[in-house]
Each structure stands twice: as structure tokens, then as C-alpha cells.
């Protein structure tokens, strides 16, 4: 199977799969991919994410000098939440589109489970490894945007912990950070426990008992 290119000037996506009709958008840049990638209008991007109109994304970096692709990254749509979209400053009054507000996609704010490299450092990854990571990432698919945000934020906290075995208290240490990200929720610790249970049910952590957990192999 292969993906096909949409006709020009389509506002949402660049490619589609003729078998399953899934859509993909490509963002590319010369040089290192970096932590963020420029996108279009901020309000449009937020509307797409919250309205479940976002395609899956490919991010590509290339070397114009060496005429080669250096990195090619796949990020499924269900890893997109408003928190990873960074609002840029409005264009100056002297600009042709004065006041227009663009955005950046903060790919460094996406959990590692959602950043799937097809090419890394100029080397193509094994297809079996890519398929395994995509299938595993699909377990994190959550339609409700608020529930998705909580699950991915707690997953990022777990990812930040050193080692494979950790305690509930270790995750509670992120209570302040999670409270800032979700100010409408005043019961952060119960929410943390709920997300850990979901991550266990989805196969990303094991519960060892007595408030202890273990990260599962990727």
C-alpha cells in the first residue's frame, strides 16, 4: 500500500491512504527538526484538534546541501492536544497580514510513545519496529480531548521518572505541574491514580502492589 497526494490547495491534509481514507499532513524543513515546527493559524489549529479534524502528521528534516532526508517522524493525530500548540506573536501592523496569529507545534511536548521515527539520523528504521510502535501507540487513542490531555500528561510524568520501577508518591511529585495544566480540576491526586490505572489497562505500566509500578518494555 502507498499514500496518495491530494490535489493542491487542500486546507487540511497533504496525503491520504486509498485503502482506509486516513489523512496525513507533512511539515518539512531544511536543517535540524528541533523542538518545534511552525504551522498555520493558531485558532484554526486549535479548532482542528478540539473538533477531531486533525490528520496524522509527518515531520521531515532534510539537508539541502547533501540532498538527503535526515529525519522523518510520524505522530498520530491522537497525540495532539491544545497544550502542544504554541501561540506566536501577532504579525506587526506593518505586515501584509497585520494581526495574524500563527502557531508552533511543540513536538518536544508529545510523549515519546507518540514520536515514531521512520528515518532517524539519516538511517531508515526497520519496518517491523515502526509497525510495532504504531500499533502500541494506538492503545493511547482517546477521543475526548480533556481525557486525552490528562492521560498524555500523566504519561509524560511517568516517562520523566528515572528507572523502570516507580512509586505512586513519585508521580504525586508532579501534582503541582498537573494542577497548573488542568486548573479546572481540584482533585489532582485521584485523577493521577485514575490515569495510572488506565496506563496499566493499556499495557504501558504494571502494578506491583503497595503503591509501586513498573514501566513495560516499549
Can you describe what each PLM-predicted range is?
Residues 2-8, 27-31, 208:
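Short Cys/His-rich "knuckle" micro-motifs
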Residues 10-24:
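Cysteine-rich micro-motifs
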Residues 20-39, 44-54:
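Short metal-binding segments enriched for Cys and/or His
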Residues 70-153:
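Long, low-complexity, charged/polar intrinsically disordered regions in eukaryotic proteins
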Residues 145-165, 197:
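Positively charged, polyanion-binding regions of nucleic-acid-associated proteins
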Residues 170-174:
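A short acidic, leucine-rich amphipathic alpha-helix
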Residues 176-192:
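Short, positively charged loop/turn segments that connect secondary-structure elements
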Residues 190-218:
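Charged low-complexity interaction tracts in eukaryotic proteins
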